[in-house]
């Protein structure tokens, strides 16, 4: 029993070391391999092969990382719910990135709408208030720094009672006109962006 415990601990440490030193290798072991996705302005991300990429419009690219009940339906889009994913948005999406569809400004957060929006986590709830939780510069591949903002947000019911919390993370590259937006706190995304390439 003791020998099995030691072996399990050693195996766990080996996996941890591989994850910390080689994110791409960690993705491969989890999903059976990786693939490269070429996006705007030469930005290329290495992602697990199990992830789907919806590229119907180059300014609204969605990388689906898990369950997505709206995929393949007419509800699929930026204002849907329950779709584990992140977005890579371009100039057309940025032109309507704020309330009342004004141009995006990173200090306010991306939220194109003129009315109450559906909560990204549940179609039974609505977006509530959000507050800035973190900001700074983050590496997105060699030679590129993104203007990073993390917003602590809520989802509320019809009586405006808070029912759940989520974070909206944004990496904005103003020169390339690219915004990476994540509402699911995907644990691998920061490393994927840091290890991005530009061609």
Model-predicted regions and their roles:
Residues 1-28:
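Secretory targeting and sorting signals
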Residues 27-37:
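Cleaved targeting-peptide boundary
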Residues 40-59:
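Proline-anchored loop/turn motifs at beta-strand termini and strand-loop-strand connectors
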Residues 47, 167, 192:
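Residues that flank catalytic or metal-binding motifs in active/ligand-binding sites
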Residues 58-176, 183:
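Conserved polar/disulfide-associated segments of primarily extracytoplasmic proteins
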Residues 51, 173-199:
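Surface-exposed amphipathic alpha-helical segments
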Residues 34-36, 43, 169:
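Residue-level detector of beta-strand structural context in well-folded domains
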């Amino acid at each position: 029993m003791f020998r099995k415990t030691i072996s399990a601990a050693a195996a766990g440490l080996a996996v941890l070391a591989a994850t910390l030193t080689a994110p791409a290798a960690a993705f491969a072991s989890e999903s059976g391999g990786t693939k490269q996705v070429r996006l705007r302005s030469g930005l290329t991300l290495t992602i697990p092969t199990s992830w789907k990429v919806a590229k119907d419009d180059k300014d609204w690219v969605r990388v689906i990382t898990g369950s997505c009940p709206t995929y393949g339906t007419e509800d699929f889009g930026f204002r849907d719910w329950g779709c584990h994913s992140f977005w890579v948005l371009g100039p057309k999406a940025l032109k309507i990135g704020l309330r009342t569809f004004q141009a995006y400004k990173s200090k306010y957060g991306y939220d194109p709408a003129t009315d109450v929006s559906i909560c990204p986590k549940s179609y039974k709830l609505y977006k509530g208030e959000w507050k800035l939780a973190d900001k700074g510069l983050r590496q997105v591949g060699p030679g590129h720094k993104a203007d990073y903002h993390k917003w602590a947000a809520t989802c509320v019911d019809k009586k405006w009672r808070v029912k759940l919390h989520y974070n909206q993370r944004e990496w904005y590259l103003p020169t390339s006109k690219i915004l990476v937006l994540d509402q699911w706190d995907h644990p691998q995304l920061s490393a994927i962006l840091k290890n991005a390439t530009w061609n």
